[in-house]
Structures are given as C-alpha cells and as structure tokens.
Amino acid sequence: MANEIVTTAQERMKHSLASLQRDLGHLRAGRANASLLDRVQVVYYGAPTPLNQLASITIPEARVLMVTPFDKSILKDIEKSLYESDLGITPANDGSVIRLVIPMLTEERRRELVKEMGKYIESAKVAIRNIRRDAMDTAKKSEKAKEITEDDLKDLENEIQKVTDDAVKEADRLASVKEKELLDI
C-alpha cells in the first residue's frame, strides 16, 4: 500500500513535468522549433484538425519553419490558421509551401517570455504540491484505517516529501535551461 501511494504520486508528478516541458516548448526563443505549431488548428472539412496531421513541418534553416501540406488544396486554410494563431509570425505562401521566418527577439520580448515562463513554472509547482497533498491525505487515511503503522506513516510522508522535492528541483532545472535559452542572443 505504501509503495503504491509513492509510485502513484511519482507518476502524477512526472505527468505534470511532461506538461511543463510541452508548455515551455511553445515559448519561442528566436530559433525555429516545430513544436511552435503544435497548438495550431486548421479547419479541415468543417472540423478543427491539428496542423501536424495535415502537413509536414520542417526546419530548412535555423530561423525558418517550412509547412508542406499533404493536400495542396488546403494551403489557404493553413495560411489563414497561421495568421489567426497567437504566434506573431507572418506566413509567406509561395503556392506549394508556407514559410515562417522566426524574427529575432527584442530584449523586451525576451523579458516578457521569461515572465510567461514563470507562470508555467509556478502552475507546475502548484500541481506538484497538490499531488503531494493528495498522497499525504491518502497515507493518513491508510494509517487511520490501520493499514499502516504510525512509524510507517512518518516514513511514507518523508518519502513523499523527497519525491516532491525532486520534482520541484526538476521544474527549477527546466526553468533555468529555458531562461538561459530565452535570454541568450
């Protein structure tokens, strides 16, 4: 029972960290990254469809994304979706592919991105702390139900805290790596 509580908490924390990594991947740092387009949805036959299911996304140069649709008839729809997205990048349509040139970031924009990153980090830490609280509550219920002893409860709480500390350290590490990437010119 005790190991199950820790394992469950650890898995949930890993999911929170994976979500944080995805969110941080969407913050552009002046260089092309295909994950920038992960959230772009294109209306295809009346249904919103992820762009990466309708086109191949390549990086021919360090600051250029190239979107090549599998079906050339939806080129205009893809271009429209890219215009309407919150990317802040103007697509260039040459008739068969769409090129997205990633502009260099200004110092001010870099600072804004670091602030936005801070929000992602904080929400990940809140999620991790909530998972810890849930695990602690489950452990206390197990002790009240006489499934584990009071000593086992203390050991379990210490183990849950260690897992939590490791997850928070990993979130901080991801933050420092991304901040360095954002602030490097």
Swiss-Prot record:
The cellular location(s) given in this protein's UniProt record come to: Cytoplasm
Question: Under which name does UniProt file this protein?
Answer: Ribosome-recycling factor
Task: Kindly list the GO CC terms recorded for this protein.
Answer: cytoplasm
- Alphabetically ordered keywords of this record: Cytoplasm, Protein biosynthesis
Please state the span of the N-terminal signal peptide per the UniProt entry: none
By sequence similarity, the record places it as follows:
Belongs to the RRF family.
**What InterPro entries does the entry give?**
Ribosome_recyc_fac, Ribosome_recyc_fac_dom, RRF_sf
Q: Name one GO molecular function term.
A: ribosomal large subunit binding
Tell me, what does this protein do in biology?
Answer: Responsible for the release of ribosomes from messenger RNA at the termination of protein biosynthesis. May increase the efficiency of translation by recycling ribosomes from one round of translation to another.
Cross-referenced PANTHER family, in alphabetical order? MITOCHONDRIAL RIBOSOME RECYCLING FACTOR PSEUDO 1 (PTHR20982:SF3), RIBOSOME RECYCLING FACTOR (PTHR20982)
One Pfam family from the record:
RRF
Principal location = cytoplasm
The record's Gene Ontology biological-process terms are: translational termination
